[in-house]
Amino acid sequence: PSAPSPAIVRWDMVGDAPEGGDPIVSLPGVPSAASNIEIKRLYRVESSGVYQFVADLAPGVGQYVDSVQSDALGRALPSTEWDMPDARMIGLTALPNGILAGFFENTLCFSEAYLPHAWPVGYQLAFPDDIMAISSTSAGLVVVTEGQPHLVSGSSPDAMAQIELDVPQSCVASRSLVDMGEYALYASPDGLVAAAGRDARVATREVLSREQWQAMQPETIHAYRHDGQYLAFYDGGCFAFTPGEGIEFYDVQADAGYYDAIDDT
């Protein structure tokens, strides 16, 4: 089900019941946009404060006489807190256990497991700085920001924990963040930062000075994972980086890239 509509009728069962005791509920119309609505599901709340199932109705039904007795009400409404995703959200990323993640400004969002339309506000996490990009790795979700990076981990969207990684390196290019499997790489002011679990370091420090790195205009980098290498394009060329092996430069330009897992190209 979707998130519930606002309450559509209030009925004082003691002093304001209609004749015969059965209220007539006027239902909202179907939106004019193509919403692919199959049924309307009616719930009722009584003294317990919990909305319980009353009936399934066809989309075009405009009124319903509610004659269902209290002891015949069905299960509780599961979608009370299933908020729509924030319209500003970007960076949609799949996590294990059917969870999706996205972000806007300094806020990280999570969906309900296997319910990509449900994004409870109560699951959101705030960060000290605006988020630049996110990437799912085997150790958790790497969140790079305009300040320090963070690692977020958890098995369910309502129990995610965030820790700040001990490397004072912001992300200077959102498209530079790449999942490399057990770790992620991203472009910082001083070089490529490798974030592996709770550990993070500038991985290119031994092969490139800060001055050499800055001359490559790291804020223009967009990068991809290919054959275990970090393949990056920037305004001026291309390079492939492999931790422990070094960096190779190529005279190639590209505006975008895509990894085809079927052909491994």
What do the predicted segments below correspond to?
Residues 50-51, 72-77, 115-120, 157-162, ...:
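Beta-strand initiation motifs
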Residues 128-265:
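Beta-sheet-dominated scaffold domains
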